[in-house]
Swiss-Prot record:
Reactions performed catalytically: N-benzoylglycine + H2O = benzoate + glycine
Function text: Cleaves hippuric acid into benzoic acid and glycine.
Cross-referenced InterPro entries: Amidohydrolase, Bact_exopeptidase_dim_dom, Peptidase_M20, Peptidase_M20_dimer
Family membership: Belongs to the peptidase M20 family.
Stated name of the protein: Hippurate hydrolase
Xref: Gene3D superfamilies: 3.30.70.360, Zn peptidases
One GO MF term attached to the UniProt entry: hippurate hydrolase activity
Keywords for this protein: Hydrolase
Pfam families listed in its UniProt record: M20_dimer (PF07687), Peptidase_M20 (PF01546)
Keyword Hydrolase annotated: yes
Record CDD domains: M20_Acy1-like (cd05666)
Length: 383
């Protein structure tokens, strides 16, 4: 690998910062101390700092020269509601809150790049987006709705995530869909309760909900093109409390994912049609509440071509995978992708334990790798 020497020299200093953030994890939209630390460091490095963008987001801006070129680099800051089970000397000090997805590392790597870039000559505007609430709460959307790109516009936006694939590759990137969309549905099946001995006098929501659960699985198997990808997963089914009472209501919660907008739209249409049909057939009411968690993380071809050249220079072509299969997991960087030319990459974490696990450990070696990637992207574009 051909990492930036000055960044490697700063590795130890920023490991301590990462460990400090790890010890003090904060959930989405509650990243007050993390945001304060980020803002403080950026000010020390000489950046213009803007706080409370999208509630707890932070933006650092550094302009040099007279070019109109603008590049955005993004990192997420939030932790997960999970009890840490590692034996790390810097393990979480908070009960049931843990950096189990490596966002402490993402944030620190961008701070490391920020310090290095402040000492470099470039021509244009460097925008650093420190995003809150990636874990299902729509922090990216909140920043955008708070005027992120009106105030701090970028021609391209780049981001990355650590991934414990267990591969010998170090860097992963592809054109098109990198990660799936994610939509959550909460469905209420409303019938009429009654005595278990007289089902004919009730309108059984459990029976109707059971039909619904089975019918929903036909969307992927019978409606989605087999060459496309979609997932419909029922995560919760609740109804009743007694063995001899037919309840009034049954509830279903599910996650729906797709790798393209056409398939995503198709699944949504089928969900509503199936619910309507089962409601009519069983003389009950079905209410649907949909929440958009994240759009497809759709990488832009131009941005990928540019980022790929940087990755080859840093990691060596043999250590890069440019046709990696997209993941059915989601990432709200997809909201950025809907607005700007973006490229979202994965860096190998070299750890067997997967994300969102109480024993997960972020690999500190990624700090210099990711910071070098961020820095090279900025310097190459703003040359």
């Amino acid at each position: 690998m051909n990492l930036i020497p000055e960044i490697l020299d700063l590795q130890g200093e920023f490991e301590k910062i990462r460990h400090q953030i790890h010890e003090n994890p904060e959930l989405g939209f509650d990243e007050l101390c993390t945001a304060k630390l980020v803002a403080q460091k950026l000010k020390e490095f000489g950046y213009e700092v803007y706080e409370e963008i999208g509630k707890t987001g932070v933006v650092g801006v550094l302009k040099k020269g007279n070019s109109d070129k603008k590049i955005g680099l993004r990192a997420d800051m939030d932790a997960l509601p999970l009890q840490e089970c590692t034996n790390l000397p810097y393990k979480s000090k908070k009960e049931n809150v843990m950096h189990a997805c490596g966002h402490d590392g993402h944030t620190t790597s961008l701070l490391l790049a920020a310090k290095y870039l402040a000492s470099q000559n470039f021509n244009g505007a460097l925008n650093l987006y420190f995003q809150p609430a990636e874990e299902g709460l729509g922090g990216a959307k909140a920043m955008i709705e708070d005027g992120l790109f009106e105030k701090f516009d970028s021609d391209y936006v780049f981001g990355w995530h650590n991934m414990p694939f267990g591969s010998d590759k170090k860097f992963y990137l592809k054109k098109g869909a990198m990660m799936a969309s994610s939509d959550s549905y909460s469905i209420e099946v409303i019938g009429r309760g009654g005595h278990g001995s007289a089902p004919e006098k009730a309108k059984d929501p459990i029976y109707a909900a059971s039909l619904l659960i089975v019918a929903l699985q036909s969307i992927v198997s019978r409606n989605v093109d087999p060459q496309n990808s979609a997932v419909v997963s029922i995560g919760a089914f609740n109804a009743g409390h007694a063995f001899n009472i037919i309840p009034d209501i049954a509830t279903i919660k599910m996650s729906v994912r797709a790798l393209d907008n056409e398939t995503r739209k198709l699944t949504e249409e089928k969900i509503y049609k199936i619910c309507k049909g089962i409601a009519q057939a069983n003389d009950i009411e079905i209410k649907i509440n949909k929440n958009v968690v994240a759009p497809v993380t759709m990488n832009n071809d131009e941005a990928v071509d540019f980022a790929s050249e940087v990755a080859k220079e840093l990691f060596g072509e043999k250590n890069c995978e440019f046709n990696h299969r997209p993941l059915m997991a989601s990432e709200d960087f997809g909201f950025f992708c809907e607005m700007k030319k973006c490229a979202y990459a994965f860096l190998e974490n070299e750890n067997d334990i997967y994300l969102h696990n109480s024993s997960y450990v972020f690999n500190d070696k990624l700090l210099a790798r990711a910071a070098s990637y961020y820095a090279k992207l900025a310097l190459k574009y703003l040359k």
